[in-house]
Regions:
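Membrane-associated alpha-helix detector
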Residues: 2-20
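Short, charged juxtamembrane terminal tails flanking transmembrane helices
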Residues: 3-8, 547-553
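Juxtamembrane low-complexity tails/linkers enriched in Ser/Thr-Pro and polybasic
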Residues: 8-12, 32-38, 506-519
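Hydrophobic, aromatic-rich membrane-embedded alpha-helical segments
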Residues: 17-37
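Canonical hydrophobic alpha-helical transmembrane segment
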Residues: 28-31, 52-61, 533
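Structural signal for the C-terminal ends of transmembrane alpha-helices
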Residues: 37-41, 544
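Membrane-interfacial entry segments at the cytosolic side of transmembrane helices
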Residues: 40-55
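Noncatalytic, solvent-exposed loop/strand surfaces
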Residues: 58-546, 551
Length: 553
């Protein structure tokens, strides 16, 4: 009998139910590395594949960071040492976020801190004693409130706090109730300045000046306003750059208006041609020009009313000079050369005696003491000493009992160390902790330091040694703005928020607080990686399900 040969049924290839190592590596690198070692042809191949995926992981996470930036969740922020960092975006403040105060204004509280860095613009507070036992009795937080961007400080008068900030609608001159931090009035106008590199961030830089019931405020693009301090009504306004044909500075106009007698004095950027005026005095009531001086290109410090060599005068720092001008007509009395990289004269000069003035700058420049003599016409300016022991980048120094205290720009590292110098010789007495590129004031023989990381610190002002009393959490985020002090209350702000702490000697103590802020750049990177991983895992699952649903061939 014939038996027909049987043939074996063809064996169907089993469908691929999982992703390839290559695809997994593109979508989810850690899983791709796992598959490489599970499916490896050789250890060497798996090792090379792992190395490639680790390099690719940088690009992978970078794409996640780009997505966070595009969606407005993260942004690039520059620290004082000139390097970018990733931070969470707090968004741009809008007028819809404005909260009106329902608390009575203490109009009898006086008008002491009415200028940038205090009544004399020298960072000294002498109104009342302050509490100095912060270790045992920390300052009590009275209120904290959200705020728009910018580098303005605050002035306080008759129960009102005045500042400037960047809103979505433009620059805003704002008044808050000093009792609760809520709004009283706001004046908005269309303006938004940021430098070409984005290093300074968007927003106004100068601080409003209060004088005799009026507020004088200068925006970063030259908008000068005189407002009624009670209700924000515009008394007069103009753009000083347009009016005088000058050009803006690289980092915007920063100088706070100075009121002397019937004049409000401002600096108007850099000359765009010969004979252009860069220091202007307006009538404080009408805005009419009283005098204008064709001084050199101006820099970022605020003009000061000082007495040197027996003569009251206007002290200004230009791009490459320190100079004294007549208060009556702006004519030069004396000048001396002081050049800094990028023309970045930022820190305030400091009068240390009847005829001596201290000046300092960062970017490797250093500091010097000059003596101004009035024996000749014009005056003479002679150097007493110069060194590099104290380099103020944008944090101005203070003077106490013959010694200068300031934050030294250490260069490219993330540091600004507190330094004490003998004012007469320039000899360093000590160099201590890193407080970052923050700001400081002097009160009751102590240094009040607003640290770059948002902490506040109290240090005894003594040439003997660095004596830290306490360093406590205060604000969230980078803090470059100058603090303000009035009625025994410390006002702090940055580009995100402001806060008020009670530091009167008889005030009840607060809590030390716990800083919850971590390294934001690391947080952003981790979230970017997790975001990409979740998206990659979702795609892998979808691809796997699709392959399993396809019929076998």
């Amino acid at each position: 009998m014939n038996v027909e040969p049987t043939t074996a049924a063809p064996q169907l290839a089993s469908p691929r139910t999982g992703p390839s190592a290559r695809l997994a590596g593109y979508l989810l690198p850690p899983y791709g590395i796992y598959l490489l070692w599970q499916q490896r042809a050789s250890t060497l191949a798996a090792a090379f594949g792992t190395l490639g995926l680790l390099v690719y992981l940088v690009l992978y996470t970078g794409l996640g960071i780009a997505l966070l930036k595009l969606t407005g969740k993260a942004e690039i922020d520059w620290r004082g040492y000139g390097r970018p960092r990733l931070v969470w975006s707090t968004g741009v403040r809008t007028s819809a976020a404005w909260q009106t105060s329902n608390t009575a204004i203490d109009t009898n509280s006086g008008a002491y801190w009415t200028d940038y860095r205090g009544p004399q613009r020298d960072g000294r507070y002498d109104e009342t004693p302050i509490r100095t036992d912060w270790q045992q009795s920390p300052p009590r937080l009275l209120w904290k409130a959200d705020l728009g961007g910018g580098h303005a400080s605050m002035t306080i008068a008759q129960g009102r706090l005045f500042t400037m900030e960047q809103w979505a609608e433009g620059e805003a001159i704002t008044a808050y109730n000093a009792a609760d931090g809520k709004g009283l009035w706001k004046h908005l106008y269309p303006a938004r300045f940021n430098d070409a590199y984005g290093m300074g961030g968007a927003g106004p830089r100068s601080t409003p000046t209060w004088h005799d019931g009026r507020v004088y405020a200068l925006g970063a693009e030259g908008h000068l306003h005189c407002l009624d301090a009670a209700d924000g009504r515009v008394v007069w306004q103009k753009n000083i750059l347009e009016e005088h044909g000058t050009r803006n500075l690289m980092f915007g106009l920063c100088a706070s208006p100075l009121v002397v007698s019937n004049a409000v004095i401002v600096t108007a950027g850099a000359r765009a041609g010969a004979g252009r005026n860069t220091v202007i005095a307006y009538h404080k009531d009408t805005g009419a020009v009283l005098w204008a001086a064709a001084a050199e290109n101006q820099a970022y410090m605020s003009p000061m009313r000082v007495t040197l060599a027996g003569t009251e005068q206007l002290l200004v720092t230009g791009a490459r000079q320190l100079m004294g001008l007549s208060l009556t007509d702006g004519k030069p009395l004396w000048s001396l050369g002081w050049s800094v990289s990028y023309d970045n004269n930022i820190a305030q000069p400091l009068v240390v005696s009847t005829n001596r003035v201290f000046i300092s700058a960062g970017y490797g420049k250093g500091c010097a003491l000059f003596e101004i003599a009035a024996k000749d016409d014009p005056f003479t300016a002679n150097k007493i000493w110069e060194n590099k022991h104290l380099k103020n980048k944008f944090a101005s120094s203070v003077l106490h009992e013959g010694h200068i205290y300031g934050l030294d720009d250490s260069g490219n590292d993330d540091a600004a160390h507190l330094v004490c110098l003998d004012a007469s010789t320039g000899e360093p007495k000590w160099r201590a902790d890193n407080y970052g590129h923050g700001q400081l004031l002097l009160a009751s023989g102590h240094l009040l330091i607003s640290c770059e990381d948002g902490n506040m610190a109290l240090v005894k002002a003594t040439p003997e040694s660095h004596q830290l009393v306490a360093r406590l959490p205060a604000l969230d985020g980078k803090t470059w703005n100058n603090p303000a002090l009035a009625g025994g209350k410390l006002y702090l702000r940055n580009g995100r928020m402001m806060a008020c702490y009670d530091i009167r000697p008889d005030a009840s103590a607060g809590t030390r607080g716990i800083s919850t802020a971590g390294p934001e750049d690391l947080q952003v990177v981790l979230v970017a990686f997790v975001l990409m991983s979740v998206m990659g895992a979702a795609l892998l699952v979808a691809i796997t399900k699709l392959r399993r649903s396809q019929p076998s061939q």
